[in-house]
A protein has these predicted regions:
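Residues lining hydrophobic/aromatic ligand-binding pockets adjacent to catalytic sites
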Residues: 1-234
């Protein structure tokens, strides 16, 4: 926001809003909507705003660390009813392509995923929220564990010039014969995480699992003996 001039530092190193009158740059309809919001919520204190949100949208309080201290027992009962809890063990796969961080995290919450297993070789992304430290922090904030298993990733130079599904299939066939076999310990480690955490998601970038190696990791995990978990692609 500093980059675009919306906020700035004052001489005490505290973030402050700039003095520019941005409302005059809005069209008359947006100005009207903004004034309506200010009229309804402008005089509320922070706790009042949080309570209003939790009362009207209890789902957003399901991972809150402060809800119990500001909500009534009856309101907490409504919040508990929004929580998703499943007894079944399940392996998931999910790609973040085309998703905002909020939409992505909500998918994890709705499916009661308890551990996110990042199978990228390099857990770095130019997309906000999906580099390792950012994603781990976001998961921690909603009580989801995060772990990075780079041994199961594919080097970026191997992913060049993939123009058709056949190109992906050839690459992933090689991946199964080499990387997966050479990193059996890492694969068994993930299997152990599924056994202990019960609901685990493998994640990488691509939206289409057929164009991501996580599908082959999942295939190998589903082929393991004595498993008691099922599979779902998100």
């Amino acid at each position: 926001m500093k980059k675009y001039g919306y906020v700035d530092y004052d001489d005490t190193n505290v973030w402050v809003l700039t003095k520019d009158d941005y409302i005059t740059t809005l069209n008359m309809f947006d100005q009207c909507y903004l004034r309506q919001v200010m009229s309804e919520f402008g005089q509320m204190e922070q706790t009042e705003l949080v309570r209003y949100t939790y009362q009207h949208y209890p789902y957003y309080a399901t991972k809150s660390h402060i809800a119990k201290s500001i909500m009534t027992k009856e309101e907490m009962d409504r919040i508990y009813k929004q929580q998703k809890k499943y007894d079944s063990s399940m392996l998931f796969t999910i790609g973040y392509e085309g998703l905002s961080l909020e939409a992505y995290i909500n998918k994890l919450i709705i499916n009661d995923i308890r551990l996110l297993c990042d199978v990228r070789k390099n857990a770095y992304s130019q997309k906000y929220g999906f580099s390792k430290a950012q994603l781990e922090t976001a998961c921690r904030g909603v009580d989801i564990k995060y772990i990075h298993v780079p041994q199961l990733g594919i080097n970026s130079d191997q992913r060049q010039d993939l123009r058709s599904q056949k190109d992906y299939d050839i690459l992933f066939d090689i991946y199964e014969r080499t990387t997966l076999k050479e990193n059996a310990d890492a694969l068994n480690y993930v299997r152990g995480l599924i056994d202990s955490e019960k609901r685990v998601a493998l994640t990488c970038f691509e939206k289409d699992p057929k164009q991501c190696h996580r599908s082959r990791v999942a295939k190998a995990l589903m082929a393991m003996p004595n498993k008691d978990y099922s599979f779902k692609a998100l």
